Amino acid sequence: MFHDGSSAHRRAPASQAAWLLVALATTLSACGPRPTSVQAPEPPLAAKAPPAQVAAAPAGPKCGLPEDIREADWPRVLTSTQPKELAPPRPGTITLALLPDTQYYAACRYPHLRNQSDFLMRERKERNIQAAITLGDLTDHNAPEEWEFFKASLEPIADGFPLLLTSGNHDLGDRGTAKDRNTLLSGYFDEAWAKKSGALKEVMTQGDLQNAFYSIDVGKFRLGVLMLEWSPRASTVRWANSVVKRYTNHRVMVATHAYLYRDSTRYDYSAKGAEQKWNPLEYGTAQGKLSKEGNHDGEMLWNALIRKHKNIFLVVSGHVLVNGTGFLTSQGDAGNTVHQVLANYQMLDEGGLGYLRLLELTPDGKTFHMKTYSPSLGLFSYAPDQDFSFVVEPPLYQ
């Protein structure tokens, strides 16, 4: 997400002590008085585990989205929610999880990322969840205490499970200002950590996971996931083109923080300028001397990379406020369909209330069902922009 503003979960078992200590560390000054915890409704999918806890918001001004940029309807509320899953996955479904901007979970020490991690492991086998893909803005201020909390919240994730990370603007620069590209990410998550999943194939820069390619054998086909840094530089795009060309036996999806806007068009500064808020080219990473690095917004990335490759079928991104959703289908140069998805929930209370996306590939090999679910609340959203299907051509497998 875009701004430059400031900014308890109960875990009883002794094995969780490290996580608890991080959660309690000097965070109260950032978020106000420590909130009490209230019992969440029992998630219908969580019968195998105790219900999650949802932290009440701090008293007074809320930690998270700064008051001066809140919309009149803040905090937003997802509509058409219910605990019942209307269309459970059929046998043979392949599932990917998308974890949009988690910055306020880290900044405010909310338990929702922990709840998401528990859910992924609890449902991994039953739902055939092959990987979880983050969409950047992992932290709010690129601060050690936030990275520590973020990492501790992922403790339930098994070493063999692919959890894919990349940077957003708030993961860069002093206090997440994106005035430059300095980040603490590599100090907490390195190649050795990523290789435990067995999916990491290569990185652009040794020791840095912001630009990385993963290969996941989902049984019916090989899925490639290309993770790209915030506002990819020209050198990054050159590397990405070479990678996708080398892995022509993979069907590839791309994840980057800022690509699609909330009106379901790509970020395009040359045509729309500041009309599209929070374009990557307006940040310090694209200003002054750094402008020579050739930063890309969505439309630039489409033309320089995405449209050129017949094996790319999907782009996912976050970053954008207001409705936080968008969907666009375009045709690549080879006639292939490329679907582009925006998902972000940080404008909800508590920075998102744990909502994530479940991207389910049905057994026909070409139809995806996109679902929105919160493990913290035990609720699905069936609003049209939260629950929908799309078809990939050519099919991923037959």
Where are these regions (language model features)?
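Bacterial signal peptide processing site
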Residues: G32-R34
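Loop/turn elements at helix/coil->beta-strand transitions in domains of secreted/extracellular proteins
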Residues: G92-T95, E126-A132, A158-L164, V218-G224, ...
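C-terminal motif of bacterial Sec signal peptides marking the signal peptidase cleavage site
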Residues: L28-A30
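Extended active-site neighborhood of metal-dependent phosphoesterases/phosphodiesterases
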Residues: C63-T81, P144-W239, K245-R251, K277-E282, ...
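N-terminal secretory signal peptides that target proteins for export/translocation
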Residues: M1-A14
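Conserved beta-sheet core of the metallophosphoesterase superfamily
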Residues: L165, N279, Y283-T285, L290-P363
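Active-site environment of divalent metal-dependent phosphoester hydrolases
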Residues: Y105-A107, D140-N142, S167-G176, L209-A212, ...
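N-terminal active-site segment of His-dependent metallophosphoesterases
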Residues: L45-E146, A274, Q398
